[in-house]
Structures are given as structure tokens and as C-alpha cells.
């Protein structure tokens, strides 16, 4: 903890002083790219992906050998406002399903040869109801960010982050509204299937929460504390830890992007090592990506969460790295280069 004793101070300092890009590694990748047996630029965005990998790993021949999906699960007091068709007990039940191998993310990890870790964030203790009180105090929020930083402890060279938490699209919408303005209608979507009266209650909850905490919302970390959730705080911590350790990150959908948005609002360069795996069918996600100037890799109409979109995108990143490292040059293959 910093000398001032305030838990957020260390994170503010970290966010201000993040390691920058390795432009030498990026340059080396781009120089090799034009020598490979293909017309220049013909692999399109794959060529940009491998340059991004080099930039943030510092490796001139980037590889992805230990990709990991980290799924963070949290519960939210605001679900007491009857904003979702599923009870909060489903969060713990889905964590058990992940452990048993029965969820969509398990199958995608098997198909794409990805590691999977699931983090249960005090599910028996939901965060505060954001329409009545702050989600967390500063100590809890900072400690949860620090816990999220441990996601990379076992070693990985590509981190995919996702989440599970009944009610957390409401939380993500409140964060987006607080950070980027607009109206609740701009950010609130159906989530797990809220329609009709449920949707109206969800909209009302977001409006009420942002109005209640307005005096604190000039500071992005205070936005996280007042309106966030444990899984969102942990994802923000994981993104920061990955940056410190030169690990590129693939962010999943709307809720995971809300965690990235907190860091972006504090320092737009804080998420330069992040790629966004897909754009969710949750309507606020496309707007959120646009606010951060990010282009998703995939658009498959998905809105499940669990890290599924990030995990699917990981295979594209793996393929980009292999194309760069494994392809022969024109000289090696005896193929005539373009004039």
C-alpha cells in the first residue's frame, strides 16, 4: 500500500506508469512479413495481429504456446430489484458447471486447446445494491483488483478474460453510462433475457444508481467501486497484471469490456495491449467499443459471456502467430518475389 494508506493510490500510480510498446519488435515483425511467401498485405488483419503480439510481448517472432481463459464470477446486490429472469444462485451453479466441464466455454477451450481457470469471487456475499449504496468500499475493490492480478500467476502468453454473474449487464451498463454519458437506454440491453417490466426495472436501476453516486463518478476507480462488481474489479486487475508481465489480452464481451473501459478512462493507453475478441449482441457493447476506438475480431451474434468470444478469437491470434513464424520466405522456398 502507498504511503498515504489509500488502497487505490497504488493502482493510480500503476495505471499512470505502465510499460510501453516494444517498437523494435513490431518493426522486426513488419520487416519479416514482407518477405513471406504471399502478396504483401494478403493476410489482412492477421498481419496486424502478429505485429500487435510482437509489440506487447517484445518478441520478434511471437508465439502463443500457453493461452489461458480466466473466468471471474461474482454476484450483485442489485438483483434484489428483480431486473433479471434468473436468480443469483445461477452464478454458483454455473461455476459448478464450469468445474464439471459442462459449459460452452469448456467446449471452446477443448476445441482451441486453451487452458481454463475459474475464479469464484465470494459468491455468498453479493456486492451492495448500487441503487442504494456503493457496490464496494475502497479496500474491498482494491483487494479484488489485486486478487485478479493473480490470474496470470501460473504462467500464460495470451490471456483471455471473461465473466459469469447474474445481473452484471446491469452493472456494465451503469459503468458505461457513468464513464461515457448518454442515457440508460443507450447502454441497457436484455442481458440474460430481460424484457417488458424486467427491462423497465433494469433501466430504472441504472438511472437510479448513476444519479445516487454522481458526486463520486469523476474518478474511474470510484466508478468501479460505486457501480462495479467483484468480477469486474478482478478483470481490471488481470488486465493490469498482464500489461506488467508483457502478456497480450483478449477481452470478451460487454461486461469484460466495461472492466477495460474503467482502465481506459483512467489512461487510454492502459488497454493498448488488449484486443477485443468479439462484439456482443448486447446492444451497448458496440457503442462501448466505439467509445474506446476498438475494433472487435468477430461478430457472431453471441451474448453468453463466460469468455466464449475471447476464446474463439484466441484461435485467430494463434493462427496469426503461426503464419508469421512458420511460413517460408520467398528466398527459403525458391519462390519468385513480386517486382
Swiss-Prot record:
Protein name: Nicotinate-nucleotide--dimethylbenzimidazole phosphoribosyltransferase
Statement: the UniProt record of this protein carries the keyword Transferase: yes
Gene Ontology BP term (one): cobalamin biosynthetic process
Origin species: Brucella abortus (strain 2308)
Pfam family, one: DBI_PRT
Functional summary from the UniProt entry: Catalyzes the synthesis of alpha-ribazole-5'-phosphate from nicotinate mononucleotide (NAMN) and 5,6-dimethylbenzimidazole (DMB).
Active-site residues from the entry: 306 (proton acceptor)
Key word Transmembrane present: no
Family classification: Belongs to the CobT family.
Amino acid at each position: 500500500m502507498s504511503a498515504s494508506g489509500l488502497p487505490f493510490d497504488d493502482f493510480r500510480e500503476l495505471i499512470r506508469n505502465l510499460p510501453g510498446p516494444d517498437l523494435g519488435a513490431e518493426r522486426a515483425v513488419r520487416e519479416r512479413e514482407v518477405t513471406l511467401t504471399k502478396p504483401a498485405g494478403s493476410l489482412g488483419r492477421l498481419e496486424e495481429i502478429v505485429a500487435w503480439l510482437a509489440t506487447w510481448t517484445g518478441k520478434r517472432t511471437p508465439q502463443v504456446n500457453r493461452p489461458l481463459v480466466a473466468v471471474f464470477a461474482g454476484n450483485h446486490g442489485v438483483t434484489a430489484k428483480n431486473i433479471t429472469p434468473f436468480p443469483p444462485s445461477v452464478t454458483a451453479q454455473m461455476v459448478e458447471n464450469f468445474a464439471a466441464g459442462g459449459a460452452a466455454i469448456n467446449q471452446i477451450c477443448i476445441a482451441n486447446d486453451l487452458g481454463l481457470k475459474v475464479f469464484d469471487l465470494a459468491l455468498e456475499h453479493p456486492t451492495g445494491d448500487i441503487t442504494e449504496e456503493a457496490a464496494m468500499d475502497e479496500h474491498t475493490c482494491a483487494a479484488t483488483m489485486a486478487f485478479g492480478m493473480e490470474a496470470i500467476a501460473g504462467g500464460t502468453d495470451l490471456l483471455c478474460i471473461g465473466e459469469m454473474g447474474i445481473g452484471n449487464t446491469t452493472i456494465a451498463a451503469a459503468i458505461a453510462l457513468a464513464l461515457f454519458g448518454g442515457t440508460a437506454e443507450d447502454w441497457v440491453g436484455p442481458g440474460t433475457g430481460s424484457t417488458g417490466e424486467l427491462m423497465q426495472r433494469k433501466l430504472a436501476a441504472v438511472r437510479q444508481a448513476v444519479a445516487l453516486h454522481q458526486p463520486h463518478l469523476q474518478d474511474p476507480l470510484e466508478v468501479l467501486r460505486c457501480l462495479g462488481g467483484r468480477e469486474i474489479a478482478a478483470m481490471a486487475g488481470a488486465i493490469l497484471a498482464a500489461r506488467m508481465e508483457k502478456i497480450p489480452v483478449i477481452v470478451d464481451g460487454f461486461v469484460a469490456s466495461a472492466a477495460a473501459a474503467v482502465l481506459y478512462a483512467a489512461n487510454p493507453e492502459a488497454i493498448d495491449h488488449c484486443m477485443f475478441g468479439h462484439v456482443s449482441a448486447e446492444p451497448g457493447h458496440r457503442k462501448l467499443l466505439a467509445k474506446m476506438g476498438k475494433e472487435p475480431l468477430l461478430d457472431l451474434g453471441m451474448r453468453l459471456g463466460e469468455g466464449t468470444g475471447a476464446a474463439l478469437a484466441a484461435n485467430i491470434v494463434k493462427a496469426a502467430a503461426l503464419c508469421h513464424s512458420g511460413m517460408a520466405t520467398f528466398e527459403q522456398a525458391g519462390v519468385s518475389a513480386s517486382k
